[in-house]
Curated annotation (Swiss-Prot):
Matches recorded under Gene3D superfamilies: Cytochrome P450
Protein's name according to its UniProt entry: Divinyl ether synthase CYP74M3
Pathway terms, separated by semicolons: Lipid metabolism; oxylipin biosynthesis
InterPro entries from the UniProt entry: Cyt_P450, Cyt_P450_E_grp-IV, Cyt_P450_sf
Keyword field contains RNA-binding: no
Catalysed reaction, written as an equation: (13S)-hydroperoxy-(9Z,11E)-octadecadienoate = etheroleate + H2O; (13S)-hydroperoxy-(9Z,11E,15Z)-octadecatrienoate = etherolenate + H2O
UniProt entry keywords in alphabetical sequence: Fatty acid biosynthesis, Fatty acid metabolism, Heme, Iron, Lipid biosynthesis, Lipid metabolism, Lyase, Metal-binding, Oxylipin biosynthesis
Amino acid sequence: MSKPAAAAPSDPSKPSKPLKEVPGSYGLPVLGAVKDRLDFYWFQGDTEFFRIRMEQHKSTVFRVNYSPGPPGYPDSRGIILLDQKSFSVLLDNSKVDKSDTLLGPYIPNLAFTGGYRVLPYLDTSEAKHTAYKDLIFELLHVNSSRIIPEYNKVFAETAGSWEERIAKSGKAEVFASSDSMITKFLLRTIVHKDPAEPGPASLGPKFRDTYQLWTGVNFAGIAHTPLPHFLEELLFHTFRLPPFLVKKQYKALANFYRTHATEVLDLAEKKYGLDREETVHQLILILGINARLGLHKMIPALIYYLGLLGEDFQAKIAAEVRSAVHKNRAQGEEGVNITTQALLEMPLLRSTVLETLRLTPSIFYIYGRAREDMVIESHDAAFQIKKGELLGGHQYFVMRDPEVFEEPHKFVADRFLGERGKAVLPYLVWSNGRETESPSSSNKQCPAKDVAELITMQFVAEMFLRYDSFEITKDSFINTTELNVHLKSLKKRSV
């Protein structure tokens, strides 16, 4: 039986555990950071890097140099939190400052975002954080009727391309194709324009490449690539790449939004008093990084786990999907059979999606700086933290905390069903906030959390309205840095 009560946070002013010094060392200046970076990216890998130190210090809280670090990046010294209890402080905006901590110790050159600090780098105390988050909430509301139909269309296009590739070469890759699908979906839904459609400011058929190149150079400091390690280290992790490398791509993105997102820009300017040009750059990152990468990474992970579970489990999901859709069949637009109500009546599918998010969240790291001196408790100790110290959590470990989750490393599709599921639901964090909490303009939780879950559920529902089952290739794999998944077969729906 799960033990969620063991992870309940206590009053930090009255620690119930023995107070200890935070273990760990940063090593020699610069050299210590370089050693940790080489271990992190090369010699050990990101999960082993933390696992080895957790065992060495016999603690889930310890000091570490975050990567990439000096000499080319700022001071990377911080404290890692690898259990549910200590990690909870990162979700408390009264305790941690999120200014410029999206990537931990550094923020990319602002030239990558038109010279503006965009929403993910803003703390909840900043007025623009509230204004831009309220704008996103309104965009989701006014476009709510477009979400399911637009997703249905892009799914049909993508599924057709998968079928063609399997027929031609025996397999279809999922990562890049789902990225293109999600990018199209977001821009059609929010901007009301297909990025590949010919015309003024079109991004053309290689719109994904434009976004991907800008993303890659922007976040090169934390990149994992297929390059030989010494090249990756030299090119990306030692010094920052200059923004001019993607000036052309970023200009194309900005022109697309200036030209086609006029309704959004009007709303931002007239209702929220936001600068029109700044909003262009906010949209590029909010839609192109936060929303795009968040939604896109869920798809290969879901296909992978559903593929491993096999045909019998897929049949259960298919039956649930088809029953709920039949009961709540949509009226109106031809070909769109799914409704929001139907999705809400698919509990096994929802649990499967949440379990995927537990094991493979879109972002594994959350950071923040202590607003004041405080005491943080883990399951077995308490630690004094100084104001300004950089705190980070790695969700690979937090979402596998054995004090909370039964068989924490195993994919359990029905984990979040029934009373057992209800008990552990508050400890699921994938959206920069707890599953049982709601995003607001005063917190850092993803504003589209609930919509993102429904969209991801819709993806699986679309799969089983079109197919009876599917298989993945034997060499498919996923981990914290790669989602290498290929479809081997798609068995068309028989009834």
